[in-house]
Amino acid sequence: MTKYYIVTLLLLFGVTNKAQAQFGFSHEIGGIMGPVAFQSDYGERNDISTNAGNTGFGIGLIHYLNFSYKAECNCYTPETYFNDHFKLRSELSYNKTELQHFGKWVDKSRTSLIANQLRGMRGSTSVTNIGMQLEYFPLSIRDFTSTIGSWAPFVSLGGQFSFYDPEAYSTLGELDTPLTTPVKYLGATTNQGGTVWSIVSSIGTRYKLTELSDLMVDLRVQYYFSNWVDGLNPDPKVYLENRANDWNVW
């Protein structure tokens, strides 16, 4: 089954912390939570039920280095374009998604062996991420910081290192046998966890609630350099619709 893009939102609530900071920069800390649409080898392309059904949940902690403000003197840093338009974000997050096949190939009207096997396939994956992103704010960070009720749109790009733990099974019996598993997935399943690098990119905006707190809405795409994160990996040379690696949208 192929991957299909879905738009979901990640809500973040961040509280800045003007404590003494290493290198003189101020720190911001916050928590993130929101739905995770996992694009995997489960489901069908261009199918709404696939995108809605294979959606999990993610939570995490984030930390920012704010280059525009010096914590030790409660004053601004020297005014440069970089200091006033960039922040460095580090993150520790966790997400889990329950997975199964959706779409016309598993419709109740289909009674073939393959349809029954697809309906019986189940899976899940848990992913723990740690990494960093560089966020770019086209508007002035200083102006945003000093103005309650203001907005600060941004884009970001970075990388993460992830620990994943997949589970694949069948309600019909032991997986990876001709009785329970479609030919496409024979020898292409695993319950073994692993590690993987990924690229992360996001677009969003902050809203200034108070002097020390922001609310952020963030749309993030994470692309893994592996097709095993979901526990399935059909031969991409034979099944071209499955040639893309796993990815998700927060």
Where are these regions (language model features)?
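Short glycine/proline- and aromatic-enriched beta-strand/turn motifs that initiate or cap beta-hairpins
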Residues: A21-E72
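Short loop/turn motifs that connect adjacent beta-strands in outer-membrane beta-barrel proteins
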Residues: A21-F25, N66-H85, S124, S140-A152, ...
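Predominantly the C-terminal beta-signal and adjacent terminal strand-loop region
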Residues: G24, S40-E44, S49, R206-W250
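Residues that define the transmembrane beta-barrel architecture of outer-membrane proteins
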Residues: F25, N51-F57, D84, S126-I130, ...
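Residues on the lipid-exposed face of transmembrane beta-strands in outer-membrane beta-barrel proteins
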Residues: G31-P35, I59-L65, A71, M132-P138, ...
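Structural signature of outer-membrane beta-barrel domains
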Residues: G34-S40, N66-S68, S93-L99, Q160-P166, ...
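Extracellular loop and loop/strand-boundary signature of outer-membrane beta-barrel proteins
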Residues: D41-S49, A115-G123, D143, V183-N191, ...
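Flexible, surface-exposed loop regions and adjacent strand-edge segments
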Residues: N46-T50, K104-S112, T171-P178, L232-L240
